[in-house]
A protein has these predicted regions:
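Nucleotide-activated donor-dependent transferases that construct or modify glycoconjugates
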Residues: 1-13, 102-104, 199-200, 278
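A short, glycine/small-residue-rich beta-strand->loop->alpha-helix junction that serves as a flexible
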Residues: 7-21, 44, 205-208
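A charged, aromatic-enriched C-terminal amphipathic alpha-helix characteristic of glycosyltransferases
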Residues: 14-15, 327-330, 341-377
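Glycosyltransferase donor-sugar binding loop
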Residues: 42, 227-243, 260
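A short, active-site helix/loop in glycosyltransferases that binds the activated sugar's phosphate group
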Residues: 132-172, 177
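Conserved donor-binding/catalytic core segment of Leloir-type glycosyltransferases
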Residues: 189-208, 214-221, 228-229
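Nucleotide-activated donor-binding/catalytic signature segment of Leloir-type glycosyltransferases, i.e.
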Residues: 240-268
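Nucleotide-sugar-dependent
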Residues: 279-295, 307-309, 313-314
């Protein structure tokens, strides 16, 4: 089949780029041809080595907009979305199936007012999770699309329903792991003999309360050598200055800081270089949206310390690390201390669980599940 991907989200890198890459490379491995359709001004941050079709209408970014500008940008994006949908419908002879890899209920709402809903080819919208507050909007839009059986909503989640609800055009499947694709890497089968390297990676923003985390880490007692590596990329000057202040403040505390953005092979080498990953993020949305860093850890088979609202279904099935009660800083310190001190005796437990999780959520299995949804029998409604 010739699989088309419609991508309209411009990002400097990270999980969005890697997710598209999974679709491209895994579907190619299954014998399919892949092409992209993108807005006229779209700039790729990675060369997927695929043909590209351009659509009239500029991609809109919210990164530097606020207030009225943000409202104007949102309105402009909705207008352009209808233009893109119409053009995709007109060009459907150029592909056998269409995937929109990062969608929300707004995409479906717009589809209900577009000729694209009558497409003759399988069209799959991938939603990366659904919050309780938006579930009714999602189901309302999905119900209206039931007469159009070429339209499928693929929800990345755990289980076979969305808050106990099912529709014939909604397909829950597990998300894929992120794996090293540009470096030679084999998961370690040995417990580290030197210092246990724990990585805390991601974008730094002042509201993340990094200093509280560092103070908790430094206050505990460890029975083995340990090194904390903190990587932070910053988008705004005020965040950059604040991160530099923190680096200076903790310069003599045995913590390694990396103030830089990491993409591609650099990012992969950084993840591969540590023994475990720290994920202290606490927010209700993590219960409903799959964690990109958690599925990076599984893909690289790195044990984790994470809050208990980080995809709890995964931890119920696989002991890939330890969790602490979300938002409880004291418990984070206690769990982190025991994780480090007991790492040697628990490492084989983690390894077995990570191998099993990596197989269950592998990119190969993800592509197989998505292909099954795309190729299922359809009849135009």
């Amino acid at each position: 089949m010739r699989i088309a991907i419609f991508e309209n989200i411009m990002t400097p890198g990270g999980h969005e780029v890697d997710f598209d890459r999974i679709i491209v490379e895994e579907f190619r491995a299954r014998g399919h041809e892949v092409v992209f359709f993108v807005p006229e001004n779209f700039r790729f941050q990675f060369d997927y080595k695929t043909p590209v079709g351009r659509l009239d209408g500029e991609a809109v970014t919210y990164s530097k907009s606020g207030g009225l500008r943000k409202l104007f940008a949102a309105a402009k994006r909705e207008i352009n979305r209808q233009r893109w949908y119409s053009q995709l419908f007109a060009r459907q002879s150029e592909f056998d199936a269409l995937i929109i890899p990062t969608s929300t209920h707004r995409y479906l709402r717009a589809l209900n007012h577009s000729v694209l809903r009558k497409i003759d080819k399988p069209l799959s919208f991938i939603l990366h999770g659904i919050n309780p507050t938006e579930s009714e909007k999602f189901f309302d839009a999905a119900r209206k699309l039931l007469p159009h059986s070429n339209i499928r909503m693929v929800v990345l989640t755990f289980g076979n329903s969305i808050f106990g609800k099912k529709l014939d055009n909604v397909f829950p499947i597990p998300p894929p792991t992120y794996t090293p694709r540009d470096i030679d890497f084999q998961p370690s089968e040995n417990t580290p003999r030197g210092a246990l390297k724990i990585g805390f990676f991601g974008q730094y923003r002042r509201e993340k309360k990094l200093e509280a985390l560092l103070d908790v880490y430094l206050a505990r007692q460890y029975k083995r050598a340990v090194e904390l590596i903190v990587q932070g990329s910053t988008m705004h000057d005020e965040d950059s200055r604040d991160f530099e202040r923190i680096i200076q403040k903790y310069a003599d505390h045995g913590i390694t800081f990396r103030h830089e953005g990491l993409i591609g092979a650099e990012w992969q080498r950084a993840i591969a270089s540590v023994d475990a990953l720290l994920m202290p993020y606490s927010a209700p949305r993590y219960r409903y949206h799959w964690g990109g860093m958690l599925f990076t850890a599984i893909g690289y088979q790195k044990p984790v310390v994470a809050s208990d609202d980080m995809n709890p279904e995964v931890f119920e099935q696989f002991r890939i690390g330890e969790t602490f009660p979300s938002g409880n800083v004291d418990e984070l310190g206690r769990v982190l201390e025991s994780f480090i001190n007991d790492f040697d005796q628990n490492s084989e437990i983690y390894r077995r669980a990570l191998r099993a999780a990596a197989e269950e959520f592998s990119p190969k299995n993800f592509a197989r599940r998505l292909e099954n949804i795309i190729t299922r029998e359809v009849c135009n409604g």
